[in-house]
């Protein structure tokens, strides 16, 4: 299984006091880097030879995979948390915060105290819903090593020594074998059936472009790797091309404001992929304009920075 990048949800140029450069670096380097590590580790685990590997090797890989997975999940939540004005809490959520923290103000104070208490360290402050207790909590995550965000456990083996020492001494292997023979699969099935009813995170998309066909960076790469001919148009506004000397390998830059000047360079017999900086308006609008002219055009979700975050090949942009 290969994990896929989520397009950047917030619009970096609209944030107050946070520069687009910070968001770009964070998304491309940190989130993209975590996604690349996650996929590399997942690939290594899937091809892992259990018969010949040294003891503990798989444990290390699974630990590192969990860290990378948590990093991607939390970064996606972080970017999805940005983009509002930060002032008015919607009434239903305000009532929930008042119920669980005493007041919205108290909740804010606690979040700030937790965040400031991590100064110079590393980790996360997370507002979480605990289904078992039916309440919200503030959670501190040390690095990325807490349990997977949003996961609902259905089976667990306690490997602390207190779980087996009285019967098995230090023979953990015998304990595990005995545990496996004592699993209540009917109860486990019940928990599984309950877990799959949990709603997945609400998909993030631009409502104004909901009907425009999109393609993910991973899907574009798969087409290229398969040798499929695709016309890739870098439709970043001209002023963005002066800020970056890189372009997606195999793409051509064309001014989105002068579409009529270059549209005849494209073939209606070959699929077209357009992209802009972040995968918002310009790439979508260019795809819409091309589709109106009879082209099989889609926009690449996440745009230039999603391609870079995925580790897609880049080349120098010819500015001549």
Predicted regions and their residues:
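Short amphipathic alpha-helical segments
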Residues: 243-246, 286-288
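Short acidic-hydrophobic, aromatic-tinged amphipathic segments that line or gate anion-handling sites
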Residues: 254-255
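Catalytic cysteine-centered active loop of the rhodanese-like fold, especially the PTP/DSP P-loop
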Residues: 260-309
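Short active-site oxyanion
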Residues: 228-232, 249-250, 271
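Short, hinge-like loop/turn segments at secondary-structure boundaries
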Residues: 249-251, 314-318
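Flexible, polar/low-complexity N-terminal or interdomain linker segments that lie immediately upstream
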Residues: 195-243, 318-320
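Short, structured coil segments at secondary-structure junctions
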Residues: 247-249, 293
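Feature for soluble, non-membrane regions of globular proteins
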Residues: 1-204
């Amino acid at each position: 299984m290969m994990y896929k990048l989520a397009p950047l949800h917030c619009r970096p140029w609209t944030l107050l006091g946070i520069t687009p450069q910070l968001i770009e670096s964070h998304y491309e380097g940190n989130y993209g880097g975590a996604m690349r590590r996650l996929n590399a580790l997942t690939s290594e685990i899937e091809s892992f030879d259990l018969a010949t590997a040294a003891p503990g090797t798989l444990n290390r890989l699974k630990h590192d995979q969990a860290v990378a997975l948590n990093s991607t999940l939390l970064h996606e939540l972080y970017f999805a948390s940005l983009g509002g004005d930060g002032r008015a809490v919607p009434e239903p959520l305000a009532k929930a915060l008042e119920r669980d923290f005493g007041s919205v103000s108290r909740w804010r104070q606690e979040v700030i105290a937790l965040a400031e208490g991590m100064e110079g360290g590393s980790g996360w402050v997370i507002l979480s819903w605990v289904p078992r207790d039916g309440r919200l909590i503030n959670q501190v995550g040390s690095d990325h090593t807490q349990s997977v965000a949003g996961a609902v456990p259905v089976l667990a083996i306690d490997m602390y020594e207190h779980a087996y020492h009285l019967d098995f001494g230090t023979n953990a292997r015998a304990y595990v074998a005995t545990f496996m023979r004592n699993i209540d699969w009917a109860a486990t099935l019940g928990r599984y059936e309950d877990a799959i009813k949990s709603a997945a995170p609400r998909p993030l998309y631009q409502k104004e472009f909901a009907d425009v066909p999109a393609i993910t960076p991973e899907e574009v790469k798969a087409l290229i790797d398969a040798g499929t001919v695709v016309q890739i148009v870098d439709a970043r506004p001209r002023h963005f091309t002066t800020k970056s000397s890189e372009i997606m390998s195999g793409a051509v830059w064309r001014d989105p404001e002068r579409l009529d000047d270059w549209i005849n360079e494209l073939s209606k017999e070959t699929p077209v992929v357009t992209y802009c900086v972040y995968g918002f308006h310009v790439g979508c609008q260019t795809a819409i304009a091309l589709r109106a002219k009879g082209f099989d055009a889609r926009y690449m979700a996440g745009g230039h920075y999603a391609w870079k975050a995925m580790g897609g090949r880049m080349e120098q942009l010819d500015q001549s």
